[in-house]
C-alpha cells in the first residue's frame, strides 16, 4: 500500500495544531475589560445610589476597568503615571454618569453609548 502525500500531511498538521497556543495573545494576560462585546452587554443590578439600569451598566464597567488597571499596574504593564491617568479617566466617566442621573433621573441610550465608547478607549490602552 502506497502512502500518499495527503495521508502523511494530516498527522503533521494535527500535531502542529495541537502544539500551537490556544490564543493569539498567549504571551499577554487578558483582562475582563478586554472583551469589549461582553463588557457592552453587561447587565448590573440596581440598588443603593444606583437608580437606573444604564447607570448600573456604566458603574459595573467602571469597577471592572479600574480593577483591571490596578492588576495591570501590579504586573508592571502600566507605569504609575499611566495607571493613575487611566484610573482618573474612568472615575470621571463614572462620576459624570451619576451626575446625569441625578440631574435628569435617567441615563439616555445616547449618553450610555458615549460613555461606553470612552470606557472602550481606556480598555484598549490597558489591553494593548
Task: Please name every model-derived segment.
Residues 24-49:
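N-terminal propeptides/low-complexity segments immediately following signal peptides
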Residues 32, 62-64:
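Short N-terminal helix-initiation segments at or just after the protein's N-terminus
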Residues 8, 48, 64:
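Residue-level detector of functional hotspots within protein domains
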Residues 49-56, 60, 67-117, 121-124, ...:
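Surface-exposed, polar/charged faces of alpha-helical domains
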Amino acid at each position: 500500500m502506497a502512502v500518499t502525500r495527503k495521508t502523511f500531511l494530516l498527522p503533521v498538521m494535527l500535531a502542529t495544531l495541537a502544539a500551537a497556543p490556544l490564543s493569539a495573545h498567549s504571551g499577554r494576560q487578558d483582562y475582563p475589560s478586554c472583551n469589549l462585546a461582553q463588557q457592552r452587554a453587561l447587565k448590573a443590578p440596581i440598588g443603593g445610589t444606583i437608580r437606573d439600569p444604564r447607570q448600573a451598566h456604566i458603574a459595573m464597567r467602571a469597577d471592572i476597568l479600574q480593577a483591571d488597571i490596578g492588576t495591570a499596574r501590579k504586573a508592571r504593564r502600566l507605569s504609575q503615571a499611566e495607571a493613575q491617568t487611566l484610573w482618573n479617566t474612568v472615575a470621571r466617566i463614572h462620576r459624570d454618569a451619576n451626575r446625569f442621573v441625578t440631574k435628569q433621573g435617567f441615563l439616555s441610550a445616547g449618553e450610555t453609548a458615549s460613555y461606553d465608547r470612552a470606557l472602550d478607549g481606556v480598555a484598549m490602552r490597558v489591553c494593548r
